[in-house]
C-alpha cells in the first residue's frame, strides 16, 4: 500500500522519474528493505542504517509481530527481510551501515542473518560495520552522504 499509494501521490505532486531510491533507519530501514523486496523493480537503489532484518527471530521483533499480526508465525514472514529473501525475493544489491557499538546489534539487529541470506541468494550486499558508532542520529548524519552517493550512482 505504501509503495503504491505514496509513490502515486508524490508522482502527482512533483516532477519525478521512474528511477527511485529507498532508505531508512532502524525500523525505517526494516521498512525500506521489506518494501524493496516486496516490490521488485520499483526501486533502483536500496540502503538502510541499522535495520532490524529478522524480526521473526529476535525478542523485540517477535513481540511486535505478535502484537500486530497475532500468533501465526507464518504471517510474520511477509514482514521479515531475511524470510523474504529465503522465500525467493531478490534485490540486485544493497547497502547497509551499522555501528559496532549499537546496543541493539547482537540481540535485535543481527546483521549476520542478512549476510547469510544475501550470500545464499546471490544478492550483492555491502555491509559496513562502523567502528564506535551506535544507533543514534549522529551515526546516520555521519554516513548519509555515502548513502546519497550510493543512490545517485544507481539512479
Region roles according to the model:
Residues 1-155:
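Non-catalytic cap/lid and distal C-terminal segments of serine-dependent acyl enzymes
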